[in-house]
Amino acid sequence: ESAHSIRFLYQHFLSGITEKSLNVFYYACSYAKVDYSRFMNTTVRITLKLIPDSLQTQPVFLCVDDTMVSKFGTKFENVSKLFDHAAHNGCNYLNGHCFVSVMLCVPAWNRDKVSYLSVPLGYRMWQKKESKLELAASMIRQVMPEFHSKDHVVILCDSWYTKQNM
């Protein structure tokens, strides 16, 4: 299940680990001068610690993807006309936002077999001033120092990400 809002996160998680009110989190998200990109680094460090010793030599995967979110109104900030190659509705364009995301997949044991846990690290909303490739590269550069002890970090992405230097 995805987190739909700050309220959802508060009701299902944050209220169980702190006595702070919901308004504190609203305020922090709105006004605090926080470098949220550092959360990606912290998430990587915590996730890498979850890998069992017996699987430390297995590769980890950084997955990069983009996704589009349709908007039906016209007054949304940064809304654009986007090409949707996967559209099956007769029109390859939609009005909306495009997000580029990075996810970390780490090995874990599942019934005596290796399976991979997927942990979202971060996402950025694409705007015309910066390409999706530049957004992806920026997020990858942000987290790569956390992998200094890993020998096998594989980046997985759609083929068009490799058309230019990342």
Task: Name what the model sees in each region.
Residues E1-M166:
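Conserved, well-structured functional cores that handle cations and Mg-NTP chemistry
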